[in-house]
Amino acid sequence: TSSNGLISKLLQSASVNMKEELEKLINRQQIVVNFDEQIIFGQLEQDESAVWSLLVASGYLKVEEIEYRGLTLEPWYSLSITNLETVSMFSNMFKSWFAAASANYNEFIKALLNGDVKAMNLYMNDIALATFSNFDAGKHVSERSQPERFYHGFVLGLLVEVRDLYEVRSNRESGYGRYDVILIPRNLDRDAMILEFKVKETEEKTLQETVQKALAQIEIKKYDAELKERGIPKERIRHYGFAFEGKKVLIG
């Protein structure tokens, strides 16, 4: 339907927080959000939370409960995915974000599963070039949050592409901090993976330096703690640092 096209466009350029809430929904968790139930279409571009209202009104999400908070009794809604049809609608939507680079996207997934870093770099840069600007939320977006919007969208795509082989978890506590993404194999014959994303800081001379920082962070903060607790040995855990500078990506 036409509202799906609108929902897709709004979610693609949505903030990192909103994409994280989508990840939870796809993983069949409930989320708690605040929005105005009266959708005013003119507000959709300005007020990000209006998308939740649109998703509820379209029947994709259902309200499990409402809690009224504060002096103004602001409504906070617990939302969950309505049914499997919604899961497939979201899956198709996330895939469509990378349609302009779909062949490269599939090749990237293959390279990631095979641990081929050279091919990962090649395809990831092609994907970023072809699709990066679609994640743009407009003129007011900082250079820093722009790549973040892109790679969180990328994680959502990853979530649906490899879900048969891996449980994809993101932004959770493990060791001494919060990792970006871990891929936990459903069959222990496969390697587990930790992905850390970093936007290049001005004081970093090269993207290689940014990659090294990402990899060091995985080690120092012991992000593999959760995987080891699940009985996955260290030699079966791959670490990848993704460094971003505008549309350029380096993976190491």
Task: Say what each PLM segment does.
Residues 1-222, 249-252:
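Extended alpha-helical interface modules used as scaffolds for assembling large macromolecular complexes
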